Amino acid sequence: MSELAVILGLSGPKLTVSERAFFRDANPWGFILFSRNIENPEQVKRLTDSLRETVGRNCLIFVDQEGGRVQRLRQPHWRRYPSGAIFQDLYAQSEAMGIRAAYLSYRLIADDLRAVGITANCAPVLDLPRKNADPIISDRAFGTQSVQVIDIAHAVMAGLMNGGVAPVIKHIPGHGRAKVDSHKALPKISVTRQTLERTDFIPFRALSDAPMAMTAHAVYECNSRTAITLSKKSLTCLLYTSPSPRD
């Protein structure tokens, strides 16, 4: 993947004439679908086929299908999946049960995605939420302790990959301390590098063999005054070299 590679979205449930021409010319690395692009299984499959036909190759097509609040493929056409907090609760009762439940849930998600031509899922979430942080992560997380997050996230990755879907770990190097929603404002995380090394960074290092990672759109002031989405220095502080889509 080139440093200049891009993943593009589109305006609605089917390709417009102008989008088709633009995508053919731009030849993006992949595409991402949002709720505005999704109506029913037959429509999504036609759309993913059209996108690949437009660029002339079997490109990756991404979606955010975590379960809970973040689920682009929804009822009544698709199953409703639990949030990350459910696996956290199950893990507290029995580690094996929490891990197995996460695997099975994401294995089913993989089947749903592959059936409509989606081949990459922006999951699992590896962030460690803090009590004073914005609730944008909250129940999407697998826990507040790195050990359980790592265990559950490994199961999630296995479920997706065994179903033929590429996982995208997120939000590297940790969004759990952000005090604002990064979709609305730019969070600035001001704790020391040493603190991050002992906490937020741990899950991302443990899963650094993931095929892809999505960056957090935040400033980590111990490394740079620039948002990590634009800062190679901040990204390399984790020594993470896999492709990294920007959030």
Language-model features, listed with the residues they occupy:
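Conserved small/polar residues in nucleotide/adenosyl-binding loops
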Residues: Y240-D247
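Short, acidic/polar
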Residues: P13-F22, Y106-I109
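Short, well-ordered coil/turn segments that N-cap beta-strands
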Residues: S2-L4, R57-C59, I118-T119, G163-V165, ...
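Boundary/entry segment of secreted carbohydrate-active catalytic domains
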Residues: M1-K14
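Acidic (Asp/Glu)-rich catalytic clusters
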Residues: F22-D25, T54-V55, L207-S208
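Enzymes and membrane/adaptor proteins characterized by extended Gly/Ser/Thr/Asp/Glu-rich
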Residues: N27-T48, T54-Q148, R177-I189, A216-R225, ...
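Charged helix-capping and loop-helix junction motifs
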Residues: A227-T236
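Acidic, His- and aromatic-enriched active-site or binding-groove loops in soluble protein domains
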Residues: R140-G159, P187-F201
